[in-house]
Amino acid sequence: MKKRILALLCALALTVGLAGCVLSTPDTVGTIGDVEISSGLYLLAQFDAYQKAADLASSEQDASKVKSFLKETITVDADTEETATVSDYVAQQTLKNLETYAAIETRFDALGGQLTAEQEAQADSYAEQLMNQYGDTYKANGIGLETVKRFERILLKSTVLLDLVYGENGETPVSDADLTDYIENDLYYLSYVAVPLYNTTSYAFADDSQKALMLELAQGAMSSYNPTRPATAAAQQSAFQSAATAVLPDLYDVTATTDDPADASFSTSLLSDSDLDTSFTADGSADAIRALQMGEATAVQYSTLAMMMAVRLDPLQMSALDALRSTALSDMKSAELQDALAEYGASLPHSLDTSAMSKLPAKKIVNNSANSTTGN
């Protein structure tokens, strides 16, 4: 009988203990404005904040050791050399993330925004892809599929907000004149062909002298094109492609590549100034592209693996303004919108439950994946 009573008491204690564990994880941590912040969204915001801190870690700091890393000090602004403890930084960035999420939801609704069924399906599909790829990391941090779906819809709403605020029929529309000026002066419409700096069969890399020869040959072809370039963008693109195709056999000969020049793939891209720095990583290559006048061509080594022959074309001769509007608005106004959302989110009434948030501490973050992401 005593054994049965003891067993019953143990079972009861286990049941109470399990119930306590379930109840210790809140469904919500409160609201910002009228937007409810679920515990999952809080954990996602906190996990993203931790990843930002990890990106700022020095080579001697190990962000995979969460408890010790939270006590470390990181430099949060390289220009001012401002520092903060990781725990403080994560707390601040978590709140900023939540304020931005709430601001997006609130502004989107206030401006009459509504995602289409197709847009919602797109966001949900991407969320499922993220869970398939990073699900173990998300689950280890208490982040489920529904939370990731909500997050992806918030991101999509922020994109739609650009048009709701700055579009033709937006709250503060950007004029066609301003948009045209930005497209012509701040964006780079390139037609280009990439040339590998290695033999495409043996993968033997070109040495420095071979690279120099290839650039000399390519630049010679571009220098011959430039003085005789036509007046219109379409004609410039055609003449550039002819000049580039003509020199490809000589470039391929340097690395003994047997590819057919006729199979070379010419592409076009509309790039922002920041895109140039991201895409053209070899020294001086981004500045060489920036220096191009409309219709002018050049050759650059843009990475360790390839060189490029490129011509800058007038975007509005290649595409209609409406076709470029969303890309231009995104580049022109995204930073301004993000700043406005951050300020607006901070101004909304905060009704966050510190007790609930204390049950979701940063020290419980699991950071064992170098490839973890929140879709940003």
Predicted features and spans:
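Positively charged n-region of N-terminal signal peptides that target proteins for export
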Residues: 1-9
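C-terminal motif of bacterial Sec signal peptides marking the signal peptidase cleavage site
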Residues: 16-20
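N-terminal targeting/tethering segments
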Residues: 23-143
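Cross-family detector of peptidyl-prolyl cis-trans isomerase
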Residues: 23-24, 33-39, 237, 241-248, ...
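PPIase-associated folding chaperone regions across multiple families
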Residues: 23-25, 138-216, 276-376
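Sec-exported extracytoplasmic/periplasmic mature domains
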Residues: 47-54, 95-116, 125-139, 153-170, ...
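A solvent-exposed, charged loop/short amphipathic helix patch at secondary-structure junctions
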Residues: 61-78, 201-227
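Peptidyl-prolyl cis-trans isomerase
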Residues: 220-283
